[in-house]
Each structure stands twice: as C-alpha cells, then as structure tokens.
Amino acid sequence: MTVKTRSNIAKKIEKDGGPETQYLAVDPNEIIQLQEESKKIPYKMEIVWRNVALFAALHFAAAIGLYQLIFEAKWQTVIFTFLLYVFGGFGITAGAHRLWSHKSYKATTPMRIFLMILNNIALQNDVIEWARDHRCHHKWTDTDADPHNTTRGFFFAHMGWLLVRKHPQVKEQGAKLDMSDLLSDPVLVFQRKHYFPLVILCCFILPTIIPVYFWKETAFIAFYTAGTFRYCFTLHATWCINSAAHYFGWKPYDSSITPVENVFTTIAAVGEGGHNFHHTFPQDYRTSEYSLKYNWTRVLIDTAAALGLVYDRKTACDEIIGRQVSNHGCDIQRGKSIM
C-alpha cells in the first residue's frame, strides 16, 4: 500500500444528511511506524497443530457432506442447506461486519437479537472477538497488526492465519482498540457468555434435527450436509474476502491499496466482494456499488429499515465517490462495479 496516496482518501461519509469523520480510517503515520517496528523484531510463525487437526477433520466431513448433498440428500435438504448458508452468512455480513465492526447502521434490539442468532449459525467466533480482529484488519491493513496480513501470501490470508499463533502486533494493537460499544451491548454480552452452547445448537444440532423431523431426512445426511458441509462452505466464502478479494480483481476507487473488486466473492459472500470500495469507504453500509441482485446483505438491511428495525444507514455521497475515483482510481473500472 502506498501510504502517502492512501492518506488522501476521502474520509467523509453521509449520516442523516451531514458528513462525519470516517470510522476506522487509516492513519498513514501509524502504518509507517508499525512497518518500521516489524523490521526490528524477528518473527517466526508457530503452527497450532490442534487447529490444523480440527480443520482437517472439518474438511473431511465437508467432503462427505458434499457427496451426500449431490447424490443422496432429499431436495428439501438441499434447499434447507442453501438457506442456512445464506442466513448464516447474513449473521457475518449484516451482523458482525457491517453493524458491529463498522457501525455503518443502527439496529433495534429485536434486529440485533436476530442477527446474533444468525451469527451463531456461522460459528466464526463470537461477534466481539470477530469485530476486534476485523477492526485491526482495517486500521492496520497489510501490516503485522493485520490478523490476515496479505503480505504473508494467499494461503495465510485465506485460512493460514487461523492455523498459527497471532503475531504479537495483532495482540498489542488489538488491545488498544476501543471495544466499549460492543462490550456494553447486552445482546453481544449474552452471546459471549453462552457462546459454546449457542453455536453447537445453531450450527449443528438444529440443522440436523429440522430435516429429520420435518421431511424424514436421515440424521447422517442432515448432519453432514446442512451441518458440516454448509459450515465449511460458509467459512471459505468469508475467507475469500481476506484472500481472493485482495488478489484477483480491479481497483476503481483506490489503485494504491491491495483490496480489489471481485464478483465471485460478492456472490459467495452474499454481497461482500466490493472490497476496494469497502476499504476506501469502510463505514458505508452498502460496502460496494454493486446492484441489489449481487448485494443480498444490503437487501436484508434495506428491508429491515423499511420495517423500522434498522436506521441511520451511512453512505458515502456520490460526489465524494466520484472525486475519489477521479483522483485515485479509474472511471472505466468503476463501471464494472456498478452492475
């Protein structure tokens, strides 16, 4: 990332008709300082073999589930598995990401409870833990304080970061982040306190019981399709944002940073693949300029807003986006991001 150019990015966003300072905006001086510190401290990745074994077992189980989904499962189970993937994805995209990590909109208590339940289906750490890592990623992108630092390679950014101990800078900088907004949310406090039983119930037990009870699917098929395969697929959809959406795509909004626009990840992660836009305007609740047919998460948020469950949706105004593209991006490439 070219820090000097990155510092010129527009940091204004619209809220209730007026601009405010962009949340999680990058501080170029802080980035330079972290990069200099990293040069002085030798670091060797330490593999966590327990995690390696668990992920290996999960992928073996997911392979069984994929076979069952294609050749053995009832059509109701196939649809149910897809719906669980979509709504579990919403628990990450609309919940942990856009609402709680970026504060890009506000939600009523019923909506926050709904998103917390969906987040349990996804099983990607409790929201407070997830949001802290994600805020580190945005504040210190591509430094050693970034949990899935892309300078360590595609595999590390994708899932390797979960197979090794966190870099000391991730822990040190993460401890400095203000997480009081999340720690004071009773919905998230409840989730953190009861996380293990909640995720076992929402991610595995209910996805197994529901097909068995309602359409007489076998427990074996239900567990491996709606449970393990769906869970593993959702993980990779999320991980592709950290990897593929930093490597393969175009940069309409800021050519100096690693995040790119990637249609595949937009589809796989229910609307999250406009990553160059998102890192340029991290508090825009839309996360991209993609149309609603690609941005399913925005559809959910807008629908909830129409029902009075969501409010204060923040967006970057067209004038600021246009100026940013003209100064640091590419108008032609922007056209590919408005589909």
Swiss-Prot record:
It comes from Caenorhabditis elegans. This is Delta(9)-fatty-acid desaturase fat-6. Belongs to the fatty acid desaturase type 1 family. GO terms for molecular function: iron ion binding; stearoyl-CoA 9-desaturase activity. Induction: Expression is regulated by nhr-80 and nhr-49. InterPro entries: Acyl-CoA_DS. The histidine box domains may contain the active site and/or be involved in metal ion binding. The chain crosses the membrane at residues 52-72, 77-97, 195-215, 219-241. One of its GO terms (cellular component) is endoplasmic reticulum membrane. Expressed in the intestine in adult worms and in all four larval stages. Additional expression in the hypodermis in all life stages. It catalyses: octadecanoyl-CoA + 2 Fe(II)-[cytochrome b5] + O2 + 2 H(+) = (9Z)-octadecenoyl-CoA + 2 Fe(III)-[cytochrome b5] + 2 H2O; hexadecanoyl-CoA + 2 Fe(II)-[cytochrome b5] + O2 + 2 H(+) = (9Z)-hexadecenoyl-CoA + 2 Fe(III)-[cytochrome b5] + 2 H2O; heptadecanoyl-CoA + 2 Fe(II)-[cytochrome b5] + O2 + 2 H(+) = (9Z)-heptadecenoyl-CoA + 2 Fe(III)-[cytochrome b5] + 2 H2O; (11E)-octadecenoyl-CoA + 2 Fe(II)-[cytochrome b5] + O2 + 2 H(+) = (9Z,11E)-octadecadienoyl-CoA + 2 Fe(III)-[cytochrome b5] + 2 H2O. It comes from the Eukaryota. Cytochrome b5 CYTB-5.1 is specifically required for the desaturase activity, its knockdown or mutation alters the enzyme activity. Its main location: membrane. It is found in: Membrane. Keywords: Fatty acid biosynthesis, Fatty acid metabolism, Lipid biosynthesis, Lipid metabolism, Membrane, Oxidoreductase, Transmembrane, Transmembrane helix. It is a multi-pass membrane protein. Its EC number is 1.14.19.-, 1.14.19.1. Delta(9)-fatty acid desaturase that acts preferentially on stearoyl-CoA (octadecanoyl-CoA) producing the monounsaturated oleoyl-CoA ((9Z)-octadecenoyl-CoA), one of the most abundant monounsaturated fatty acid in Caenorhabditis elegans phospholipids and triacylglycerols. Also acts on palmitoyl-CoA (hexadecanoyl-CoA), heptadecanoyl-CoA and (11E)-octadecenoyl-CoA (trans-vaccenoyl-CoA), the monounsaturated fatty acids (MUFAs) produced are further used as substrates to synthesize polyunsaturated fatty acids (PUFAs) by several other desaturases and elongases. Pathway: Lipid metabolism; monounsaturated fatty acid biosynthesis; Lipid metabolism; fatty acid metabolism. GO terms for biological process: innate immune response; long-chain fatty acid biosynthetic process; post-embryonic development; unsaturated fatty acid biosynthetic process.
